[in-house]
């Protein structure tokens, strides 16, 4: 879509003009008018549609052959819908009349050359590119929306390169093109027109920092044929007509949506009249396309697993073996980060979050590297970044981070409906402080990044009461065959005390926690009776329960949950330096691989040969068709304030729902 162009005609000599197919041209007949003119007639050769617009109140009418009263408010509108075969092969003739003269007072002739110009992309995400029915200057969300989609080309398809694909101005391998979006410039019209007219592809300096364009200028199977023409320091490019009527471009994103960047990028092509050597070229027509950079999307634990990651460290051989067996049962790949690479940093959940980006032509997994920068800090970039696996990170300029900036404090819910609004990709959950308080929060650059993705609007929970301060310490999600398709699990001191009281009433008060723990240092056992008589422990867990209850209400409101969607998992906490840590291995901090759950072995009281905590958890989860495997993480993880989820990570299958079909 382009603004109407005005062409002025003359009585002294014929005028020539270029018009674009389907675009209206206003013909100004008032600049040169014979004296005594009262009426005019206008005539066009076949293929030229002429309309008269009398005024704002009356709609336009076809000119036909009748005479029109000469009135300065009248507009003459000319439209051609097919490109010309030759220069000036169509024309419009205006004759000026007086009631006192039988013959026309004068004639004005406008010769027209029509050219069809369109800059197109995959406008409606399904491959249809009909520019007649959409405003390509807009990007519209929803199933009936339209607009192009651009991937941030943040993988590394050529293993011999040291940087990501979009970090330079070259195409290093042909596979790199699969991560780019195609943009096509089509022109139809007389070839001679382009002897003194030119086409310029251009963008703003702002957008040039966020996307770049390659023009195919040679054989498609040769990397050197892809010339970098826009992006970074280049904002305009005169397009040579190398392939006649169609020139193809490949576009890649450089930046994800973020603070100050909505994700929208515009490209324009302008036809310029360069026929006069004494003047600069003048614009005739501009066509525009708008791309939205695809957001980074998180995957909830209810989606099918594809690959499990775990670190091998000095004292976790049995743990790694147990995770490997669970991955085998779930039918997913296992990747073990060796100790030489992790340098005894086992918290792989905290180091990174595995998500994806998606366009109609390509889905690309992308790892989000946390700013925690422990000994694992090189693993995402050196080992996960590669062909068809992208990488992104955000770090504060002053590099000041807290424990909340680890990605055990970054989760996402399954799809939900809350307060009448659908969230088909779920909502991101991050931990912070209470509103108005001065406690710890996730660093601003990470929060800005998450909010800017738009498709999974974040919910901030209260975690500052926890020593580590991660949302995965008190909640998780598991798949379910009914209801909303999932259950939210919440750690519950109240449920644990209730369970222990029931066992005490049945005469099992002497049953011991922590029996059978294998550790370098002897772990002191404690009985149910001792737990239930410890007033400090009881009072502290009442406080913990109040903190979890606060989050429960926030989650019910923001995720649209009812009590039947929530399962309370028995759990106790203890205080360390006025913050909470798990009293026994934290049961909700589990690894979810489809129907297979890897749950921290709690070492709870043994009653009739069974751990009553394990038995209770099984009774809550197995009716959902889930299989519970309890993994001993006591020494290598629990004693270091982490559990199974903290020590593992999962790459999951993307949502079947396409993000561009939602309305944020």
UniProtKB/Swiss-Prot annotation:
Keywords: Calcium, Cytoplasm, Disease variant, Hydrolase. Its cofactor is Ca(2+). InterPro entries: Cupredoxin (IPR008972), PAD (IPR004303), PAD_C (IPR013530), PAD_central_sf (IPR036556), PAD_N (IPR013732), PAD_N_sf (IPR038685), Prot_Arg_deaminase_cen_dom (IPR013733). It comes from the Eukaryota. It is an enzyme of class 3 (hydrolase). Changing residue 509 to R: In a breast cancer sample; somatic mutation. Its main location: cytoplasm. It is found in: Cytoplasm. CDD domains: PAD_N (cd04214). Hair follicles, and epidermis at very low levels. Its EC number is 3.5.3.15. It holds the Pfam family PAD_N. It is linked to Uncombable hair syndrome 1: A form of uncombable hair syndrome, a condition characterized by scalp hair that is impossible to comb due to the haphazard arrangement of the hair bundles. A characteristic morphologic feature is a triangular to reniform to heart shape on cross-sections, and a groove, canal or flattening along the entire length of the hair. Most individuals are affected early in childhood and the hair takes on a spun-glass appearance with the hair becoming dry, curly, glossy, lighter in color, and progressively uncombable. Catalyzes the deimination of arginine residues of proteins. Belongs to the protein arginine deiminase family. This is Protein-arginine deiminase type-3. It comes from Homo sapiens (Human).
């Amino acid at each position: 879509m382009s603004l109407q162009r005005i062409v002025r005609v003359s009585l002294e000599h014929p005028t020539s003009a270029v018009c674009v197919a389907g675009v209206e041209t206003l013909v100004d007949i008032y600049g040169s008018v014979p004296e005594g003119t009262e009426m005019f007639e206008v005539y066009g050769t076949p293929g030229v549609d002429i309309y008269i617009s009398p005024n704002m109140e009356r709609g336009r009418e076809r000119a036909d052959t009748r005479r029109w009263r000469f009135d300065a408010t009248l507009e003459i509108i000319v439209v051609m819908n097919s490109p010309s075969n030759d220069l000036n092969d169509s024309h419009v003739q205006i004759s000026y009349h007086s009631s006192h003269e039988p013959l026309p007072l004068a004639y004005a002739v406008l010769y027209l050359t029509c050219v069809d110009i369109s800059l197109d992309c995959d406008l409606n995400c399904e491959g249809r590119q009909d520019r007649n029915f959409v405003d390509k200057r807009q990007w519209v969300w929803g199933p009936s929306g339209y607009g192009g989609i651009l991937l941030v080309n943040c993988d590394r398809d050529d293993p011999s390169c040291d940087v990501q694909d979009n970090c330079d101005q070259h195409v290093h391998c042909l596979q790199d093109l699969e991560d780019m979006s195609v943009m096509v410039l089509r022109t139809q019209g007389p070839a001679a027109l382009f002897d003194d007219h030119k086409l310029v592809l251009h963008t703003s300096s702002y957008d040039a920092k966020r996307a770049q364009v390659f023009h195919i200028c040679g054989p498609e199977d040769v990397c050197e044929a892809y010339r970098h023409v826009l992006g970074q320091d280049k904002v305009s490019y005169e397009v040579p007509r190398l392939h006649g009527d169609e020139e193809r471009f490949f576009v890649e994103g450089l930046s994800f949506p973020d603070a100050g960047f909505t994700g929208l990028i515009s490209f324009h092509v302008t036809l310029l009249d360069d026929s006069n050597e004494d003047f600069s070229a003048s614009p005739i027509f501009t066509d525009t396309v708008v791309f939205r950079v695809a957001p980074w999307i998180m995957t909830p634990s209810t989606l099918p697993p594809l690959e499990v990651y775990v670190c091998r460290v000095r004292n976790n051989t049995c743990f790694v073996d147990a995770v490997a067996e669970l991955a085998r049962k779930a039918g997913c790949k296992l990747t073990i980060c060796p100790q030489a690479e992790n340098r005894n940093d086992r918290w792989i959940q905290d180091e990174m979050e595995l998500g994806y980006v998606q366009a109609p032509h390509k889905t690309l997994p992308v790892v989000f590297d946390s700013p925690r920068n422990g000994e694992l800090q090189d693993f995402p970039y050196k080992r996960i970044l590669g062909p068809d696996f992208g990488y992104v990170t955000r770090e504060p300029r002053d590099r000041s981070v807290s424990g909340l900036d680890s990605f055990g404090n970054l989760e996402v819910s399954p799809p939900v409906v809350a307060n009448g609004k659908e969230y088909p990709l779920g909502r991101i959950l991050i931990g912070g402080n209470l509103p108005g308080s001065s406690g710890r929060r996730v660093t601003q650059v990470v929060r800005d990044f998450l909010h800017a993705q738009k498709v999974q609007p974040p919910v901030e929970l209260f975690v500052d009461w926890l020593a580590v301060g991660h949302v995965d310490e008190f909640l998780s999600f598991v798949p379910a065959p009914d209801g909303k398709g999932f259950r939210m699990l919440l750690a519950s001191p109240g449920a644990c005390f209730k369970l222990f009281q029931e066992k005490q009433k049945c005469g099992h008060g002497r049953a011991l926690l922590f029996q059978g723990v294998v550790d370098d240092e002897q772990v002191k056992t404690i009985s149910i009776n001792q737990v239930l008589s410890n007033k400090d422990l009881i009072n502290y867990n009442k406080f913990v329960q109040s903190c979890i209850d606060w989050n429960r209400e926030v989650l019910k409101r923001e995720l649209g949950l009812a009590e039947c969607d929530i399962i309370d998992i028995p759990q106790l906490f203890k205080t360390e330096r006025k913050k909470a840590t798990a009293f026994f291995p934290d049961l909700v901090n589990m690894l979810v691989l489809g129907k297979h759950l890897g749950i921290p072995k709690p070492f709870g009281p043994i009653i009739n040969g069974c751990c009553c905590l394990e038995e209770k958890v099984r009774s809550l989860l197995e009716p959902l068709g889930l299989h519970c495997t309890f993994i001993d993480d006591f020494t290598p993880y629990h004693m270091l304030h982490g559990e199974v989820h903290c020590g593992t990570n999962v790459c999951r299958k993307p949502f079947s729902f396409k993000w561009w079909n939602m309305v944020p």
